[in-house]
Amino acid sequence: GILLRDPESGLEVLLQYGVLEELDIITRSVKVVNRTMGKVVLLKAASMCLDWLSGDYEWLTFYGKHAMERTLQRTPIAHGISAIGSVRGASSHHYNPFAVVCEKDTNETKGLCYGVSFVYSGEFLMETEKDQIDQTRLICGIHPDDFAWTLEPGESFDTPEVILSCSSEGFGKLSHN
């Protein structure tokens, strides 16, 4: 992992990675450790953040309802912030904690695409943002609306894992990873 430490407070954040080479996936989570002398309250806990420095992307998300689960929604990533999530206490077929960021011409057999699956059955938030110089960011984690976790000195908090995969051969290859 990669350890980040605030030299003033002593708060530590460990970016944890797992590599499952035979499955062509990477896992990512975050551990926050309170090495301070007092309580720390976490108000947001993202498991991952991905940045693309250039490119024109779309993202695929899935929503659903009774007898129509996993309805595909393909949306251009425009300037500003776009989000999917759930504040119902659980993830579900209404909004699935899975997304694909892809180039505009990506299809089943060609094109670059990145899959992100949040391994969590609670409230979640996935956000994309395209900034003023056309960089794209994707953040995924626990939904912050009802989240507040107190860490006493010495205590830690682990975010749920995110599973990441990539394909330069379209959605078909990505779905087999």
Residue ranges with predicted function:
Residues 1-131, 135, 145-147:
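Polysaccharide-binding surfaces and accessory modules of carbohydrate-active proteins
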Residues 20, 39, 153, 168-172:
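Generic detection of long, well-ordered alpha-helical segments
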Residues 149-168:
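Short Pro-Gly-centered flexible turn/kink motifs
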Residues 118-122, 163-177:
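Acidic/glycine-rich phosphate/pyrophosphate-binding loops and surrounding catalytic core
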Residues 138:
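Glycine-rich phosphate/adenylate-binding loop
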